[in-house]
């Protein structure tokens, strides 16, 4: 596969103690993609028995072998990221460059309160995912679960339960409250949500999931909305959401 201009390829690996020091499935994934290397490989640290030093050594090995240019973390705490950075400095290894974190209207604290400190201290940026909260922030649910939505797909029972929960209904009400703001900006609530995620300090990109080219183009329209998100507009959105993160200091 040829590398198109402006495209960034990434992979995610899951570590277990037995898989160290070689991340599992990485070469197989590269073969399936017909690539010699990816731009960035993310380490999903799901096994607390994997020593941090060995994870950092494994990712350094991946980069030194030419399989990736950089490495990042996924679903790591700020403390774990700082520990990895300290290990890299102590043993002359390669530190992570970014964290992959969930971020949307109803999941804010980590990206707004924890990761900016890492960005300023050690330069670790953020790649965020689920800007639409698995479709909850699209106004398509509106208190019900349509037959065509993801919540009806096998394996997504948890999403259906979330949509139908009291908390889910409250969140859907907040989404409906945002409709006038979206209309004022000439966009959909989904575009507003993606632009809102991009506004956060240290966020380099937002991961999108789409099922059609039309949906992709609609989501990309959020880039036009970003320039319209004035400080006053953000304050108004915060007031409607009622869940702005606050420093504990």
UniProtKB/Swiss-Prot annotation:
Main location: cytoplasm
Compartments where found: Cytoplasm
Any Pfam family: Aldo_ket_red
Distribution of this protein across tissues and organs: Strong expression in brain, with highest levels in neocortical and allocortical regions, hippocampus, olfactory bulb and cerebellum. Also strong in kidney. Weak expression in lung, skeletal muscle and heart.
Keyword terms of this UniProt record: Cytoplasm, Ion channel, Ion transport, NADP, Oxidoreductase, Potassium, Potassium transport, Transport, Voltage-gated channel
Residues annotated for NADP(+) binding in this entry: 44, 74-75, 100, 129-134, 140, 150, 209, 211, 215, 218
GO molecular function: oxidoreductase activity; voltage-gated potassium channel activity
GO cellular component: cytoplasm; monoatomic ion channel complex
Superkingdom assignment: Eukaryota
Keyword Hydrolase set for record: no
Assigned EC number: 1.1.1.-
Quaternary assembly: Forms heteromultimeric complex with alpha subunits. Interacts with KCNA5 and KCNB2.
Protein family (similarity comment): Belongs to the shaker potassium channel beta subunit family.
Its biological purpose: Regulatory subunit of the voltage-gated potassium (Kv) channels composed of pore-forming and potassium-conducting alpha subunits and of regulatory beta subunit. The beta-3/KCNAB3 subunit may mediate closure of potassium channels. Enhances the expression of Kv2.2/KCNB2 alpha subunit-containing Kv channels but not Kv2.1/KCNB1. May display nicotinamide adenine dinucleotide phosphate (NADPH)-dependent aldoketoreductase activity. The binding of oxidized and reduced NADP(H) cofactors may be required for the regulation of potassium channel activity.
Protein name: Voltage-gated potassium channel subunit beta-3
Organism: Mus musculus
Gene that encodes it: Kcnab3
């Amino acid at each position: 596969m040829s590398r198109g201009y402006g495209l960034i390829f990434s992979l995610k690996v899951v570590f277990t103690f037995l898989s160290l020091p070689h991340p599992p499935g990485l070469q197989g994934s590269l073969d399936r993609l017909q690539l010699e290397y990816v731009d960035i490989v993310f380490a999903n640290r799901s096994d607390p028995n994997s020593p941090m030093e060995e994870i950092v050594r494994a990712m350094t090995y991946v980069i030194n072998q030419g399989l990736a240019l950089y490495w990042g973390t996924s679903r790591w705490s700020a403390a774990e990221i700082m520990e990895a950075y300290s290990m890299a400095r102590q043993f002359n290894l390669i530190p992570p460059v970014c964290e992959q974190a969930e971020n949307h209207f109803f999941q804010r604290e980590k990206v707004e309160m924890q990761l900016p400190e890492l960005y300023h201290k050690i330069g670790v940026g953020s790649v965020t995912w689920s800007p639409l909260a698995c479709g909850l922030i699209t106004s398509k649910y509106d208190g019900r679960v349509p037959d065509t939505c993801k919540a009806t797909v096998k394996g997504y029972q948890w999403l259906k339960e979330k949509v139908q929960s009291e908390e889910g209904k409250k969140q859907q009400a907040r989404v409906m409250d945002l409709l006038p703001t979206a209309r004022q900006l000439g966009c959909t609530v989904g575009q507003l949500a993606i632009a809102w995620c991009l506004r956060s300090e240290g966020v380099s990109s937002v991961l999108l999931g789409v099922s059609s080219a039309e949906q992709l183009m609609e989501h990309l329209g959020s880039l036009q909305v970003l320039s319209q998100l004035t400080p006053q507009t953000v304050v108004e959105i915060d007031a409607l959401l009622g869940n702005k993160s606050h420093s504990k200091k």
